[in-house]
């Protein structure tokens, strides 16, 4: 069994809960409301403004294309990501760290801490749930060919059909398998936990979008970008 499969097995029902989250299932059923869809899109804007991958570049082995692809992704995400179409309505503040609601802020900080403290294998385990959108959304869309999606939803999913994103998933998975095979039992256990926790954080971002709510402690009535 490849180590990526061990990680998914370790995550167990959590991984399945992510793959079949109500937000995702509603999208593929053609029933996802514009409000729930745009909540997730707009809350992705603070992430697109970070430089998390650059922290990890010194840890990438020369034979892995992850750094090369992430440099290209940084350019692409700053110019063509569908999320950017929401900026005219919500304003540039939505790209700042202060616009992030708790679950989005949590996953960003989880990735940053992993990038600083972890190995390249750790980083790939922590981010795999995001790097695998080409499978979660792109491949599933091609297989199921759902109808009833809004034009913006189709445009967003089509991002993940781009072979470029499949390359990112492939090199991330390659690193997970390589490090999982070569490292110690202690490090493998850490990688499994990072995979699990990254998946749980991502579920949280979809929970927030599904519930249209993600309040900060003590906030009372939610305020800010896409709050309530």
Short names for language-model regions:
Residues 164-196, 207-210:
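Long amphipathic all-alpha helical oligomerization modules
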Residues 8-34, 49-51, 173-182:
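Short alpha-helical hairpin
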Residues 39-50, 71, 75, 190-197, ...:
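A non-catalytic, amphipathic alpha-helix used as a structural packing/dimerization or gating element
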Residues 1-2, 8, 110-111, 120, ...:
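Hydrophobic alpha-helical segments
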Residues 12-17, 31-60, 122-136, 206:
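Alpha-helical bundle segments that constitute or directly flank the non-heme di-iron/ferroxidase center
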Residues 6, 42, 65-167, 200:
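Active-site-proximal alpha-helical scaffolds that flank and shape metal-associated catalytic sites
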Residues 190-228:
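Acidic, carboxylate-rich catalytic segments that either coordinate divalent cations
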Residues 1-3, 26-39, 116-118, 150-159, ...:
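Short, charged, low-complexity loops and linkers
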